[in-house]
């Protein structure tokens, strides 16, 4: 699954501004919520839209799913289990690239 993750990660890094928030907790929340909703949409599961935040994350997830289905047609042939594993692996990689492995010291500045 790791070999399939880099293309979708590259798309996020180049096209999705939500991965660029200036604080760790913002990035953690964005990654978690948007990718959770992305997984739900890809797997045909219900998505919670009860709060304004949920709807905001959902819009980003819909855009991501549409782009992935169009650009990476191999996603359309994956089972629900494979899709869930792909998104889980993608999230771990994105968290590393944008949070834990980032050299941006502002992410953890308590005064920022």
From Swiss-Prot:
- A matching Pfam family: AnfG_VnfG
- Cofactor(s) the protein requires to work: iron-sulfur cluster
Flavoprotein is among the record's keywords: no
The function of this protein is:
The key enzymatic reactions in nitrogen fixation are catalyzed by the nitrogenase complex, which has 2 components: the iron protein (component 2) and a component 1 which is either a molybdenum-iron protein, a vanadium-iron, or an iron-iron protein.
How is this protein organized at the quaternary level?
Hexamer of two alpha, two beta, and two delta chains.
Full protein name:
Nitrogenase iron-iron protein delta chain
Protein's GO biological process: nitrogen fixation
EC no. given is 1.18.6.1
- Top EC class, one word: oxidoreductase
UniProt keyword list: ATP-binding, Iron, Iron-sulfur, Metal-binding, Nitrogen fixation, Nucleotide-binding, Oxidoreductase
């Amino acid at each position: 699954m790791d070999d399939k993750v880099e293309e979708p990660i590259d798309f996020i890094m180049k096209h999705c501004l939500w991965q660029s928030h200036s604080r760790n907790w913002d990035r953690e929340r964005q990654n978690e919520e948007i990718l959770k909703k992305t997984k739900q949409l890809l797997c045909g599961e219900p998505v919670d839209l009860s709060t304004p935040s949920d709807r905001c994350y959902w819009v980003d997830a819909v855009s991501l799913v549409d782009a992935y289905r169009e650009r990476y047609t191999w996603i359309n042939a994956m089972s629900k289990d494979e899709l869930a594993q792909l998104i889980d692996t993608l999230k771990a990689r994105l968290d590393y690239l944008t949070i834990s492995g980032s050299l941006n010291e502002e992410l953890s500045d308590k005064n920022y």
